[in-house]
Every structure is written in structure tokens, then in C-alpha cells.
A protein has these predicted regions:
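PAPS-dependent sulfotransferase catalytic domain
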Residues: 87-88, 92-210
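PAPS-dependent sulfotransferase catalytic core
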Residues: 1-81, 216-224
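C-terminal accessory extensions appended to soluble enzyme cores
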Residues: 211-234
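Generic N-terminal leader/processing signal
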Residues: 12, 98, 123, 224-227, ...
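A periodicity- and composition-biased signal for non-globular, repetitive helical segments
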Residues: 20, 106, 130-131, 231-234
């Protein structure tokens, strides 16, 4: 068993959780064999632990629709053992370790039961920006279906994504109300050259700031800065 509690990174999809995870990984948190898709999640945990659970309870493995019902979440046996075994096999020795998955909040009770001392990072983004991103992203297609729109009581794809964002936000409130050790971070602030939240988050996690972080994230923020016509001064 791993004595060190994990860092669990979540947020509504299209919110920038992958960028935050990349920073935390660069600053020393072990993540195992990171996602081939550049999303800074762990593929083995996703595909062999989380996805089967979602399939078993009959919800969407992409975390779009249908979603788990919080009050009806079942706690599977051996969750902690399965997750830690992946990390150990993939080379974990000691120190901070992390797992990033936007769907963590949809099943927070499972993870909280397995890792009650985990530190949670909730990555946020403005609702309108999330919805715009969903509408532009090919695999975000749950609410192109009129059947799904009708099921959640809306009549357009945009309204469907608004409903969906609210579902995630309700889970965030539940997590905080439950007393879980959560820190909220808004990556958009970095677009304007404000890195204070990421500094504070790393300090809270007990990880050192590395100057290479700026070289990692600035190119990721470039397109957003161009659209917003933001000039930063380092």
C-alpha cells in the first residue's frame, strides 16, 4: 500500500485540467505512464479501473450523458488497491503522486472512500467558454441528440451543455460540503499573466515551483491570448 495520499485533479471537461496536471507533474508529482493523447491522465487507470466502473453502472464513459446519480453511487471493493497497484507497477517509489480525470467529480464518493486524505484540485472555467468549446469539439456530441435533449428538459444543444455544466458544479458543491480537502483553480487567470493561484497550489501540495513551467504553459495559452488580445509582461 502507498502511504502518501494522492493528488486528484478534476474539473468540467474543456476547463484546462490537463494543463494544470502537466504543471503538477513537471513539478514532481508522479503520474505513471501518462496519456498518449497528451491529456496527462493515466491510461491504465482510466481504461482498466474507471471505465469498467462506468460501464457497470450504465453511464457514459466520457462523462457526458447519462451521468452517475450521486445518491445512488456504489462503492466497489478494492478500488484503492487497484489504483495503487497501477502506480507501483509503473514505477512509483515515493513522494507525491497524482491522477487526473474530469470524471472524478462524478464519482467523488468512490475516490473519497478509497483515499480520504487526498488533496483535490478542482479546475474551473467560465460556463460560456466551456459551452463554446463543447460546441466546437467533435467528440463532445451528447446533446446533438434530440433524445438526450428531451431527457434533460431542453430543446437545443447549447441548453444541453448548460444543463451538463450545472451537473458538474453540483458535484463540486457536494465535495466541498462533504469537507473534502479541495482547492479551486482558474487557469484563465494565467492568460493575463497572473500565476498566483498556481504558485499557491504548488505550495499547498508541497511541490517546488520550476521555472520551466512557464515554457510549458505559455505556448498553450498563446492562442487564447491572441483571441483576447492580451499582452503579458514577465
Amino acid at each position: 500500500m502507498i502511504e502518501q495520499a494522492p493528488i486528484l485533479i478534476t474539473g468540467i471537461p474543456r476547463s484546462g485540467a490537463s494543463m494544470i496536471a502537466s504543471v503538477i507533474n513537471m513539478c514532481g508529482a508522479f503520474g505513471g505512464n501518462m496519456s498518449k493523447r497528451g491529456m496527462f491522465g493515466n491510461d491504465k487507470i482510466r481504461e482498466e479501473v474507471v471505465d469498467p466502473y462506468f460501464n457497470n453502472i450504465g453511464v457514459d464513459t466520457l462523462g457526458q450523458y447519462p451521468l452517475p446519480v450521486t445518491d445512488d453511487i456504489s462503492i466497489p471493493a478494492g478500488w484503492r488497491r487497484k489504483v495503487e497497484q497501477v502506480m507501483l507497477v509503473e514505477g512509483y517509489k515515493e513522494g507525491q503522486w497524482m491522477y487526473k480525470d474530469a470524471r472524478l467529480s462524478l464519482m467523488w464518493a468512490v475516490w473519497h472512500y478509497a483515499f480520504p486524505d487526498a488533496k483535490w484540485i478542482i479546475v474551473r472555467r467560465r460556463t460560456g467558454d466551456i459551452i463554446s468549446s463543447c460546441l466546437r469539439t467533435g467528440f463532445m456530441e451528447a446533446f446533438t441528440s434530440q433524445e438526450n435533449q428531451k431527457a434533460v428538459g431542453v430543446s437545443t444543444e447549447e441548453e444541453g451543455w448548460l444543463w451538463w455544466v450545472r451537473q458538474y458544479e453540483e458535484r463540486f458543491v457536494e465535495m466541498i460540503t462533504e469537507g473534502m480537502n479541495c482547492k479551486v483553480i482558474w487557469p484563465e487567470r494565467m492568460v493575463y499573466g497572473d500565476y498566483q493561484q498556481i504558485y499557491e497550489t504548488l505550495e499547498w501540495l508541497g511541490l517546488p515551483w520550476k521555472s520551466e513551467v512557464l515554457s510549458l504553459i505559455d505556448p498553450l495559452l498563446w492562442n487564447v491570448r491572441q483571441k483576447k488580445k492580451v499582452i503579458t509582461h514577465k
